[in-house]
From Swiss-Prot:
Residues 88-151, 484-522 are annotated as: Disordered. The gene is FBXO7. The modification Omega-N-methylarginine is found at residues 431, 451. It comes from the Eukaryota. GO terms for molecular function: protein kinase binding. One of its GO terms (biological process) is positive regulation of autophagy of mitochondrion. Pathway: Protein modification; protein ubiquitination. Part of the SCF (SKP1-CUL1-F-box) E3 ubiquitin-protein ligase complex SCF(FBXO7) formed of CUL1, SKP1, RBX1 and FBXO7. Interacts via its C-terminal proline-rich region with DLGAP5. Interacts with BIRC2. Interacts with CDK6 and promotes its interaction with D-type cyclin. Interacts (via the N-terminal Ubl domain) with PRKN. Interacts (via N-terminal region) with PINK1. Interacts with PSMF1. Residues 328-374 form the F-box domain. Keywords: Cytoplasm, Methylation, Mitochondrion, Nucleus, Ubl conjugation pathway. PROSITE patterns: FBOX. This is F-box only protein 7. It is found in: Cytoplasm; Nucleus; Mitochondrion; Cytoplasm, Cytosol.
Amino acid sequence: MKLRVRLQKRTWPLDMPEVEPTLGQLRAYLSQALPTWGYSSDARFAITLNNKDALTGDEETLASYGIVSGDLLCLILEDAIAAPNLPSSTVSEHSSVQNNDQPSLATSSSQSNIQDAQLHDSLQGQATQSEVWNDDSVSGPGQHFEAEAVPDVVDVEEGTGYYLAEPMLCSESVEGQVPHSLEILYQSADCLNPCDALIVSIHLLMLESGYIPQGTEAKAVSMPQNWRLGGVYKLQYTHPLCEGGSAALTCVPLGNLIVINATLKINSEVRSVKRLQLLPESFICKEESGENVAMIYKDLQKLSRLFKDQLVYPLLAFTRQALNLPDVFGLVVLPLELKLRIFRLLDVRSVLSLSAVCRDLCITSNDQLLWRCLYLRDFRDGSIRGRDTDWKELYKKRYKQRKEAQRGRHVMFLPSSPHPIPFYPSPLHPRPFPPSSLHPPGIIGGEYDQRLTLPYVGDPINSLIPGPGETPSQFPPLRPRFDPVGPLPGPNPILPGRGGPSDRFPLRPSRGWPTDSRLPFM
């Protein structure tokens, strides 16, 4: 039978050769497997299906509990088991006592060592008991148990999850939570102002980067001796990867800033490497000065990234270069496989920029597999290419074609100027001559009359030379535009060939306006 065993948020497989194993056999197999999972073979545990109710009866088969191959079993360690949540047989089996005055499982932690020795002896020589727990006490022949009230344990994994949620590094800090190492350093440093608190965090960042405080008296749980003298902070370190060289940080407060100067000492020669300015107010809360260290610091993730990227790592790289040592970190020392996986996520400009850094990155950036991946990513090409295809040249060719096509579309759809030059034609506009701003469009005397455009409506002579009466043509006469502010369109007695006034269009001014006697064409 194959089962899955879950213990403290981790799951392992368990194989048993028996077809129908019993609970006792399962317990024996689990005891043998615990050392391989990182636990002691003497660890006491309870077998459950729902992580709460323990299974009892070692002689019962697993099938009687409804357990089949592939099921998930949850183990609860003895230390996290509460007395009210377990059946009587399991509790008595794990906590049987030989003395009359021995306390129950819920006693204080000061007697836990004595209980462990007695519980281990009782597990080997005592069978399963069947006493029943009633309320707060259990009585037996010659034995009196007094059960104390113990709060129910909801989930043994909650305690483990709490400790895992605590940040270990400054880069993992969130609001309200800081690493435990920072709390210890801050409490041992006796900080007097925000600058002191910032230097404490900087010292911890140096320790996280692998630097060791110089001097045998320096400890990781406290600040180095004489780190604060006369308003100037001095910290000295060595690094295991830079034997023969030492680094020193000199921090000087200047107004609201702290200037950090990093120097390198090799063979009594001191070189200035880096300089960084930090604002304590950005990372230290002034109003918080209590014992809660988590409320004093803020934006530790930003501080860690800024300090390490701009000072720590460049200092380490410069030290190894000064000692004529090869690089041990960074993009250059990564395997080729990892470089290609990183390069293929970049755009072409970034890849070309990396190729100009050094010879090694130039060789990596010219890999044909990389350019094939970039070509298939950036261009749609379903054609089959040969094995001898130069993918970089092909990418360059297609890239130039795309740029030329984009440039052609840009010229073709070039928008017209929003403010054309007055009195000059615009060659890109459908109407080269801009309209006059003196009259609105459609008004007599405007653009229509200045540059007259007559459409072809039929007879070019009869349609333009009206005679008496209606024009005897099969095409309608060319009528001029009407004046929207003048009289309504209709028969005009002044124009020849239009007829006289009628009842529908009387010859009278409209709305107080005089009759417009101007000719329609100027």
